[in-house]
A protein has these predicted regions:
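Cytoplasmic-side transmembrane-helix entry/capping segments in multi-pass membrane proteins
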Residues: 5-10, 34, 83-93
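Membrane-helix boundary elements
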Residues: 12-56
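Structural signature of hydrophobic alpha-helical transmembrane segments
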Residues: 55-67, 88-91, 115
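Hydrophobic, membrane-inserted alpha-helices
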Residues: 70-71, 94-102
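C-terminal ends of transmembrane helices
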Residues: 71-83
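Membrane-helix boundary connector in multi-pass membrane proteins
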Residues: 100-116
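Alpha-helical transmembrane segments and their membrane-interface exit regions
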Residues: 119-128
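Terminal transmembrane helical module of multi-pass membrane proteins
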Residues: 128-148
Length: 148
């Protein structure tokens, strides 16, 4: 089970949640506005604050929070130098390309929330590659230290 989780790009979870909302969520009649916006803007939590204002946590905020949690786990997973980590990086690259494709071509995905998810996928690919290179580099000893 752990091996399968290492292969699976976790940022696919919030992307799929967004896709489900964009496909099955309602939409406004305004053609200039993304149909997913009405579902993303609906409140999950409303809480009065000490300052007197009301804080709202929307569905879009929840998806972004899930994305940040998944990105954190992905960066931790990137410290592995096994071949499964390389497969995970390749899968993360496909998730990034999928997100860019959706963002550019479909109006339900032209939202700030989905753009931020796409940027999280970009950070996953970039940071994952950097962390893997650094952790692999520390495992490789370069010749100058062993002169006798």
């Amino acid at each position: 089970m752990r091996h399968a989780l290492t292969l699976f790009p976790l940022l696919l979870v919030p992307v799929l949640v967004y896709n489900l909302i964009a496909i099955f969520g309602g939409g406004g009649s305004d053609a200039a506005v993304s149909p997913a916006l009405s579902s993303l803007d609906s409140s999950l939590i409303r809480m009065p604050m000490i300052s007197g204002v009301r804080w709202e946590f929307s569905v879009g905020d929840g998806i972004l929070f899930l994305g940040f949690v998944m990105l954190f786990i992905e960066v931790i997973k990137a410290t592995s130098t096994r071949s499964t980590a390389i497969i995970n990086h390749a899968a993360s690259m496909f998730v990034l390309m999928f997100c860019v494709f959706e963002f550019l071509l479909f109006k339900s995905f032209a939202t700030s929330e989905f753009f931020m998810l796409t940027m999280l996928c970009f950070l996953d690919v970039f940071a994952g590659a950097m962390v893997t290179i650094v952790s692999a580099r520390r495992d490789v000893v370069v010749g100058d230290g062993f002169t006798g």
